[in-house]
């Protein structure tokens, strides 16, 4: 089986099993997913806090724990993203797929449009890829990688003011 260098398409030969997603990438995926959902849940509770005026402040420190959990999950989210960037350098060639978009490779660009046509039911037979297809690779880079970086940068902004409250 021959795999193209940048588009990761199967060019010729019978399909064989390929070890694409290593254990550290799988761990990162599920840990990042858990941190993200905890950030969503705690962020929702921070935005629309529960009513807690039925006891003293000491007894109802529930909201403070929500903010602490949100802060811890945000830091975990940032550390996991740094870990994933590190693994893109030391992992196999498929671990850097979502970080490098090979716009210089015409086969990869054609793969974006070919996959989009298949998803729109305009093409009957998709091209086979190892790992992510070019359209998924582009979507993950733009929405996940850049989105995560923006989430981290905007989330760390409020943390810089915590020294004022001490």
Give the positions of each predicted feature:
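Alpha-helical transmembrane segments of multi-pass membrane proteins
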Residues: 39-51
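Conserved small/polar residues in nucleotide/adenosyl-binding loops
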Residues: 162-166
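Membrane-proximal soluble regions of multi-pass membrane proteins
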Residues: 92-127
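Alpha-helical transmembrane segments and their helix-start/interface "positive-inside/aromatic belt" motifs
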Residues: 20-35, 136-142
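Cytosolic juxtamembrane amphipathic/interface segments immediately preceding
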Residues: 13-24, 62, 123-132
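Loop-to-transmembrane boundary segments
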Residues: 119-146
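Perimembrane loop-to-helix junctions flanking transmembrane segments
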Residues: 53-66
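Hydrophobic alpha-helical membrane-embedded segments
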Residues: 69-100
């Amino acid at each position: 089986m021959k795999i193209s260098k940048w588009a990761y398409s199967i060019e010729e030969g019978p399909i064989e099993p390929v070890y694409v997603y290593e254990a550290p990438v799988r761990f990162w995926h599920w840990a990042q997913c858990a941190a993200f959902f905890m950030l969503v849940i705690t962020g929702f509770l921070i935005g629309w806090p529960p009513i807690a005026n039925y006891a003293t402040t000491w007894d109802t420190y529930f909201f403070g724990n929500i903010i602490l959990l949100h802060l811890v999950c945000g830091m975990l989210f940032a550390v996991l993203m740094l870990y994933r960037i590190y693994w893109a350098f030391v992992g196999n060639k498929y671990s850097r797929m979502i970080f490098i978009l090979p716009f210089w490779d015409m086969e990869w660009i054609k793969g974006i449009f070919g996959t989009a046509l298949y998803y729109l039911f305009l093409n009957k037979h998709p091209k086979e890829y190892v790992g992510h297809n070019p359209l998924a690779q582009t979507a993950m880079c733009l929405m996940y990688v850049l989105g995560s970086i923006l989430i981290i940068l905007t989330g760390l902004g409020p943390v810089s003011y915590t020294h004022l409250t001490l």
